[in-house]
Regions:
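Bacterial N-terminal signal peptides
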Residues: 9-20
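Sec/Tat signal peptide C-region and signal peptidase I cleavage site
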Residues: 21-25
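Short helix-initiation/N-cap motifs at beta->coil->alpha
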Residues: 32, 93-106, 237-247
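Extracytoplasmic substrate-binding proteins
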Residues: 36, 126-209, 233-234, 287-288, ...
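Structural recognition of the beta-strand scaffold that forms the well-ordered cores
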Residues: 47-49, 69-72, 116-120, 137-140, ...
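A short, structured surface patch at a secondary-structure boundary
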Residues: 48-111, 116, 232
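Proline-aspartate-enriched helix->loop->beta-strand connector
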Residues: 99-101, 106-122, 246-263
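Alpha-helical, coiled-coil/dimerization segments enriched in small aliphatic residues
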Residues: 214-242
């Protein structure tokens, strides 16, 4: 037999071997939409599209920011202005050019050669765009657990455990510490009479054009319930960031406490000094009693689920009921969490910055990210 006749057979055998190895090195996981997704045995390059907190959650879970090949600009701004980029500077090398708001540039995405793309689960159009390009898209849901922040964080951690089994035991450690904090807060707030529970108004977005709160179908409802408080806007049924208020409605609620998220550039002093055009917040009880607070900015914006969720619950409970948590050293608990869960040791200055974020925390955070429902 001549070498020329033999060559095609060798090539065919080589191709078959390569395909066999490829098949053996792939595995199938089920995402939050129930879709089966084939991923490599070891995932090394991930693009986080429009499920914004996942860039930080992924980095914290794996302990490696270089795994994030691309992320949404709104995720990047949180990384740059919060602790993520400081603790994992390699994450700031991630590309952001593949997406603008809800518009995905498929060619730019493909150029990143991701092993996996994480997509907001309700965004079927974007999932289809990614999969049609031959890329593995895993749907991550922000609402499957009915906006229960801790349960959502648990669900996301379960997904990360499936996708990154090499981080053996990380999920169990996160769960143990989360339950510890949950139990502490629940035990210390369970005997508060209904009439004595703090009435809290979350301000998700705020500027001269709009006031957006959390009604009963968004994360603010969970935060209030878990911390032993009452959501002042519980009567609003609008889901997600669609519960818009007039100033008259705010006066009607007259909450005991106002919590500003990091999806707005507003800071507590803006409400006290009338810096928001066309709005007067000064008559509110919360403003008069100096009980307007800005949520922490840790690895990501803490109103949403993420790697800082248990710490955020502890911060909120201590902020609402300082006497009941007087013995809790939040700085110490924060350092402990980051050392055990994230694998880094925070300085006093880093802890201070986490709990006193400035306007930059909201940079780029208000843009829409879903291409469709």
């Amino acid at each position: 037999m001549s070498l020329l006749k033999f060559a095609p057979k060798v090539a065919l055998l080589c191709c078959s071997a390569i395909l066999s190895v490829s098949a053996l090195s792939a595995r199938t996981v089920t995402d939050d939409n129930g879709d089966r997704v084939e991923v490599p045995e070891k995932i090394e390059r991930v693009v986080v599209a429009n499920i914004l907190p996942l860039a930080a959650a992924l980095t914290a879970y794996t302990g490696d920011g270089s795994i994030v090949a691309g992320m949404h600009p709104a995720s990047y701004s949180a990384a740059k202005n919060g602790l993520l980029g400081e603790l994992f500077p390699e994450v700031l090398r991630a590309d952001t050019s593949f997406i603008r708001g809800a518009a995905l540039n498929v060619e730019a995405l493909m150029a990143l050669e991701p092993d996996l793309v994480l997509v907001n689960a309700p965004d079927r159009r974007m999932l289809e765009q990614v999969r049609s390009a031959g890329l593995a898209a895993y749907a991550v849901s922000p609402s499957k657990w009915h906006y229960d922040v801790v349960e959502t964080y648990r669900g996301w951690t379960a997904s990360l455990a499936k996708l990154f089994p090499e981080a053996n035991g990380k999920g169990a450690l996160i769960e143990a510490r989360t339950r510890e904090i949950e139990s502490l807060v629940a035990d210390r707030t369970k005997d508060i009479a209904e009439k004595d529970r703090a009435r809290v108004l979350f301000i998700v977005r705020l500027d001269e054009k709009e006031i957006v709160t959390s009604g009963r179908n968004f994360f603010g409802e969970y935060w209030c319930r878990a911390a032993g408080a009452v959501n002042a806007a519980h009567d609003l049924e609008a889901e997600n960031a669609n519960a818009r208020l007039s100033m008259e409605s705010v006066y009607g609620y007259d909450p005991d406490v106002v919590i500003l998220t990091n999806f707005t550039k507003a800071v507590p002093s803006d409400l006290a000094t009338g810096k928001i055009p066309g709005q007067d917040w000064t008559p509110l009880k919360a403003v008069e009693e100096n009980r307007v607070y800005k949520m922490p900015l840790g690895l990501y914006r803490t109103f949403t689920p993420g790697a800082d969720t248990p710490l955020t619950l502890l911060w909120l409970a201590k902020t609402l009921y300082p006497a009941r948590f007087e013995d809790v050293d939040l700085a110490l608990e924060t350092k402990r969490w980051y050392k055990e869960i994230v694998g880094v040791e925070l300085t006093d200055a880093q802890v201070e910055r986490m709990y006193s974020p400035d306007r930059a925390a909201a940079e780029g955070a208000s843009q829409g990210v879903r291409s469709t429902q």
